Amino acid sequence: MAVSLAGCGGSSSSSKSTESGEKVFRFGQSNPKVGLDMQTNTNSGASSVADNVLEGLYRWNDDNKEECVLAKDMPEVSDDGLTYTITLKKGVKFSDGSDLTTEDVKYTFERMFTPATGCTNTYMYNMITGAQDMLDGKATELSGFETVDDYTFKLHINYKFAPFVANLGMDYASIYPSDACAAAGENWGKGTNLIGTGPYVIKENDEQTKVVMVPNKNYHGKKVNLDRLEIVYIDDVSTKMMEYEQGNIDMCDLDTSLLDQYKDSDLKDEITQVTPLGTYFLSIKDNDPVLSNKAVREAISLAINRKELCSTVLNGAAEPASSFLNPGVPGHDDKLKTYEHNVKKAKQVLADAGISNPTFTCKVRQKEEKIATALQAYLKEAGITMNVETIDAGIWSSARAAGELQSTVLGWFPLYADADNQMYTYYYSENAVGKGVFYNNPEFDSLMKEARESNDSDKRVELYKKADYILSRKDYGTIPLYYGKLQFVAKPYVKNAKLGNLIYHLYNIDIDLSKK
């Protein structure tokens, strides 16, 4: 894998910011409704909030490059690739005034592997020696964490793992203050119970309408530009844009369903479009009585007109999928064409299998409702009934984790360009259970495992191509739909407005008061 590493070393609020000279920035987004503990969720909305408070040893910046944050340098790796020595920066404090030491890093990883935590991302780090013993309840300490002194430690892993350093740069490995986190217990990540070394601290959080943040007086890095950062929760995409037009928020995402309405409006110069690394797909519960039949899954794929979906419902802001892996991720097979659309063939596949009018339910969040409704119409033409139900985002997250969704529509985005981060995390059999898809193919698992343990980038690419083909074209274990583009709007006075790969990094935002 070629990893690019950077060098280390309401409207009333808006008017008040102008009158008082204070810089107040209000960002509108949907409510993730999963809390802000990044060990227990994979929600990008939660990341966009917690990202301002928490920091890890490393991070992926807006330019998709990994850089040092709490670590002084990139790790020193042993010749056998199994030991990583990391030194922390000295003088770093958490926002509560406590010093960052090796003990906090140790606590963070041990909390991650403690079963009671319910960490959703252990598969990214469970190659650390002793992690599985903790997950199995056989140990309470992480044997692969070796403390050298207050600022230096070693991580021992069981096998060579090419993306290990890359994974250390993800939000899921944010470092927590041991004393404060332990004291908060189950309330960690709820309300204002989130303390980090990041540039902001949470002043208010009612978990329903908004999160208010102010600068961290103990921050070790460059002073932030804002006096106040507000994350305003607005679930309805049309309401969100109305609030933006009325000046009640300064920046928000622009849902693709509304792009046609705004692209030639007075706001056209305030729209920025980006192409992330992810894939949108119809996620299927592969052990469901109806959907466990491969013929049904194949017929579903054949019935969907992806090109039309992209040009009409998505207003041209997407490309029809040809594999589960995004074209920007090594392992995507550029030789593959868009998945076939053939209603007649879909009907024949069902007939050959002796299946008549298969029926299932697709439960989605409000933002995916239009996509699901379009899919419903396509499937109906092939004699497949897909009932669509729109449910609360919080209920959706819980139902997906519990394996209670027959199907749903969502996007899955790696935070850096590596297939392990996009495909292993969702469809490796042990992880597929937690994602509610229950895909299980030993051949696929074997290819993914071999790719994980190889440091040969060319070999990894070929292994991922084979795995993707098995997943999405042989088994139809997932139904890739399209590679979407994302849009956001920002007022002319907002400076440094950028979207990383799905995550809004708001800590660099500034306000030009002279333009308000």
Model regions and ranges:
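Extracytoplasmic/peripheral linker and loop segments enriched in polar/acidic and small residues
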Residues: P75, N387-E389, A393-W396, A401, ...
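Append "and occasionally in soluble cytosolic enzymes with long acidic Gly/Pro-rich linkers
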Residues: S292-A377, E381-A382, N387, K466, ...
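Surface-exposed binding/hinge segments that line
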Residues: T87, K106, T122-D179
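Ligand-site clamp/hinge motif
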Residues: G185, N216-Y262, T385
